[in-house]
A protein has these predicted regions:
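Extended, small/polar residue-biased N-terminal targeting/export presequences
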Residues: 44-121, 176-204, 393-395
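PDZ/PDZ-like domain segments forming the peptide/carboxylate-binding groove
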Residues: 106-156, 225, 347
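Bacterial N-terminal signal peptides
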Residues: 8-17
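Conserved PDZ fold ligand-binding element
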Residues: 33-38, 136-159, 247-248, 311-314, ...
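Bacterial N-terminal signal peptides that target proteins for export
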Residues: 1-9
């Protein structure tokens, strides 16, 4: 072969390679991920090493699903919480969009929901939290029910139910392992996830008589935003005022608690007694001074862990459940050109000189979870109520 042909062959090869990359619609979003990690990840050395290793990875993706798989497989190499990839149309994308709606400048965030948090496990999809007064609760779905199918098709995610919004929909569930499946009719609705969590928090508010004590309870599926803290503060001063103790459910969901959350339990604030002209005494306190139980598990993360760590350290609460996630970094959502979201850890966080990332917070009373086929039972909550009742001083 003539030596004069070599430059032409090399040029043609280079053009083919360039053309192959240009033809891939996933090269650009892949490069966006790499650039964000390189320039914004909280650990610059790890970020640079990861970015160098994965430069151009998007070009090999053959579909949006394949790109998502490749990205989700690569990000864990950074070994950091608050670092994940959420494609459009997924529950995580909707949740993060709702939490950071103002930051992302989104005019509206609405997704299908049945009013339940569904967990995917090796055994299948199980109802982890059934939000009080929601469509699933009204239809009879219980914690621990396994979701088998929707309108005869295998269940994949609630986010995929767009075509069933406002339509009575047949959900086939398995309540007991090996038992005959049951069909529930649930009507999915469009909701803003953050608004749904706030409604669920309010609906969960109750005071129960337990072992001779009045124990208050509220679920904070998410703590992201002042509305959630305000909702708890309102309950502590109103619905819970005559309760003897309180259980705050921090399990699963999202973090986001502001450090000012701790002010709700500041015992340095004095208690007052108003005395009327008839001599009647009316005790009042601006903060909660009675026993507190924080119910946590391996998915209690971020701001919830900061609150749990601090309240335990100061003797303000007893922790019941399971060791927390150890996911305490500051993260920010970054929108890619595809509309997908990259959630990236951008700062480390110390709490009183302690790094909780990768460490978490141990509980005072360990209670294993028992989700699959629970038939509505919740042993962790039962134990939390026991501990709260036992913490009330004798009259």
């Amino acid at each position: 072969m003539s030596k004069r042909l070599y430059p032409s062959i090399l040029l043609a090869t280079a053009l083919l390679a360039t053309g192959a990359h240009a033809a891939s619609p996933f090269l650009k979003p892949g490069d966006e991920v790499v650039d964000h990690v390189r320039s914004r990840f909280y650990d610059p050395k790890r970020g640079e090493a990861w970015a160098t290793k994965h430069q151009g990875y998007g070009a090999a993706a053959t579909s949006a699903d394949d790109f998502a798989r490749r990205t989700q497989a690569a990000l864990p190499e950074l070994n950091a919480s608050h670092t994940a990839f959420y494609p459009r149309g997924t529950t995580g994308h909707a949740d993060l969009s709702a939490i950071f709606q103002r930051h992302l400048k989104l005019p509206k965030v609405e997704v299908p929901s049945i009013g339940a948090d569904i967990q995917e496990t090796p055994q299948g999809f199980f109802a982890r939290h059934v939000f009080a007064h929601g469509p699933a609760a009204k239809a009879g779905l219980l914690r621990g029910d396994r979701l088998l199918s929707v309108e005869g098709k295998p269940f994949t995610s609630v986010a995929s139910l767009t075509q069933r919004v406002n339509k009575p929909t047949r959900f086939t569930i398995e309540r007991t392992l090996g038992a005959e499946p049951t069909v529930l009719t649930i009507t999915p609705r469009l909701v803003n996830p953050k608004a749904e969590w706030l409604d669920a928090q309010h609906a969960s508010t109750r005071v129960v008589d337990h072992q001779g004590r009045r124990v208050a309870y509220q679920q904070l599926y998410s703590c992201a935003g002042p509305e959630h803290q305000q909702k708890l503060q309102d309950a502590l001063s109103d619905d819970f005022a005559q309760a003897d103790a309180v259980v705050i459910d921090f399990r699963d969901g999202w973090g986001g608690c502001n450090p000012t959350f701790l002010n709700l339990f500041n015992r340095a604030v004095p208690r007052f007694v108003g005395i009327g002209r008839d001599g009647r005494r009316n005790p009042w306190s601006a903060t909660w001074h009675k026993p507190v139980v924080l119910l946590v598990n391996g998915n209690s993360r971020s701001g919830k862990e900061i609150v749990a760590f601090t309240m335990k350290r100061l003797g303000l609460a007893t922790l019941v459940g399971q060791h927390t996630a150890g996911a305490v970094l500051a993260g920010t959502p970054l929108r890619l050109s595809t509309g997908d979201l990259l959630y990236l850890a951008v700062e480390a966080v110390e709490v009183e000189g302690v790094l909780l990332e990768g460490v978490g917070v141990p509980v005072d009373v360990e209670v294993p979870d028992a989700l699959p086929y629970a038939s509505g039972k919740d042993p962790q909550l039962d134990k939390a109520l026991d501990v709260a009742a036992a913490a009330v001083p004798s009259p």
